[in-house]
Amino acid sequence: MSRGIIIIGSGFAARQLVKNIRKQDAHVPLTLIAADSMDEYNKPDLSHVISQSQRADDLTRQLAGEFAEQFNLRLFPHIRVADIDADAHVVKSQDKQWQYDKLVLATGATAFVPPIAGRELMLTLNSQQEYRACETQLRDAQRVLIVGGGLIGSELAMDFCRAGKTVTLMDNAASLLASLMPPEVSSRLQHHLTDMGVHLLLKSQLQKLEKIEAGIRATLASQRSIEVDAVIAATGLRPETALARRAGVAVNRGVCVDSYLQTSHPDIYAIGDCAEINGQVLPFLQPIQLSAMYLAKNLFGGNAPLKLPAMLVKVKTPELPLHLAGETQRRDLSWQITAESDGMIAKGMSGEGQLRAFVVSEDRMKEAFALLKTLSV
């Protein structure tokens, strides 16, 4: 590979891949190009920055230059790739171009902001860069509206509440974590947030935002309005597919890849939050770690398909932490729930009596790994 490997992106997926590539080959030319500074930070920490009084710069774990030296890389930070000529094996920015033998897209996902009037007033917390842009406003805000009651919205609601702020959490659904589990399972977290003082607005739709002297007025579809100091969009992520689309690579919800992380073009691969692996978008750390291991080998002639075991997803709500695994979103499961003062175990059983999903909380989380071994996948 005389021209080497180019990775577009600098997040967790890109870094995991770099580490695994260097286990395969210490000298192959390896280039990373990204629109940000390329400094390393732990993205899940963004769910706790307010209660821990952290500034954006406090999140930095390793400077880009140190990473480049450690793994023998060429880095091009603060550069936005404009186009890919897949046939010529060339990546282009506005004023530079690079040739490659193999190209990996690790472009991540962007926070979805609902298309409502006043959407420009909504903040997002999907990167260190985004937090840096709004950290002063969020620290100073006393009244915060979080739009979206999924994983990130629930985590942020607890964090802002722990920091002493007045928090309203809004979602279209009738329960929290509605896309992940039924209400009888998520109700424990819902009650705990309410007990902490979080004001829940469920089955509610945001219609518009407008700047007023006292802050921001949020108007619901019901015409009810509330006044807040900051509004955060936690309404999900959208895989970044624009670059792949321009290159003629197949995209659906994400950049379409097979079990080898290969796109519709034989020398272009995708990994991480931007990738749709055999129809599944898996924006979690463990699938990314495994993807990086398999892809690094396959870039050097390996032929091993990615096999993902049953994996735990951790909800980072420290006052009522949850672990979940399996097909928790399935509507045809029968849930067996044991809830006691020390925690909850909820088992989702199929009609054939097989364990297909589970959710555990608090002190019962220690039983997660034993349950994981009995999970039918």
Curated annotation (Swiss-Prot):
Gene Ontology cellular component terms for the protein in this record: cytoplasm
Family: Belongs to the FAD-dependent oxidoreductase family.
E.C. no: 1.18.1.-
Swiss-Prot/TrEMBL catalytic activity: 2 reduced [nitric oxide reductase rubredoxin domain] + NAD(+) + H(+) = 2 oxidized [nitric oxide reductase rubredoxin domain] + NADH
Molecular function in Gene Ontology: oxidoreductase activity, acting on iron-sulfur proteins as donors, NAD or NADP as acceptor
Function per UniProt: One of at least two accessory proteins for anaerobic nitric oxide (NO) reductase. Reduces the rubredoxin moiety of NO reductase.
Protein name listed in UniProt: Nitric oxide reductase FlRd-NAD(+) reductase
Gene field: norW
PANTHER family per UniProt: NITRITE REDUCTASE [NAD(P)H] (PTHR43429:SF3), PYRIDINE NUCLEOTIDE-DISULFIDE OXIDOREDUCTASE DOMAIN-CONTAINING (PTHR43429)
EC class name: oxidoreductase
Cofactor(s) the protein requires to work: FAD
Keywords: Cytoplasm, FAD, Flavoprotein, NAD, Oxidoreductase
Pfam family, one: Rbx_binding
Localization, UniProt: Cytoplasm
